[in-house]
A protein has these predicted regions:
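Contiguous alpha-helical scaffold segments within structured protein domains
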Residues: 1-51, 122-125
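Glycine-rich, small/acidic residue-mixed loop/short-helix segments
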Residues: 36-45, 49-127
Length: 127
């Protein structure tokens, strides 16, 4: 499905499964995190490269947020997030870099994604 937001569009895929007694919610979460969308493939090499290249702590960005109960678990990937400390807000957003990606276009995509979050913190909600 296509989800249109104010600044960007996303392809969305919902997944649902009934777990067997041999697989717990935590097992499934561990198996799918981090998603290739935020860490890259092949996963081990991509994670190593990110650790070497990125000079900042991702905080909640690209993490997993959700609820787990006896009867239901639901999670999402935090593909946009903000960290507020004292009078400073750090906004996190990213782009899917693949073979053939154009750096300028990817950077503009990141700026569009971040703009939605930034507008929430603007003094007049849109400055």
């Amino acid at each position: 499905a296509l989800k249109s937001l104010r600044k960007v569009q996303h392809l969305i895929r919902k997944m649902q499964a009934k777990l067997t007694a041999l697989c717990t919610d935590a097992d499934l979460l561990k198996a799918i995190h981090p998603t290739a969308a935020v860490s890259g493939l092949p996963q081990q090499q991509a994670k190593k490269a990110l650790a070497e290249i990125e000079t900042f702590d991702r905080r909640w960005y690209a993490g997993t947020l959700g609820v787990m109960s006896q009867h239901l678990s639901e999670f999402c990937v935090t593909i946009r997030s903000a960290f507020i400390e004292e009078n400073q807000v750090r906004v996190f957003a990213g782009a899917g870099i693949v073979e053939g990606s154009q750096p300028v276009e990817e950077w503009l995509e990141i700026e569009r994604k971040a703009a939605g979050l930034i507008s929430l913190f603007a003094e007049n909600n849109g400055e």
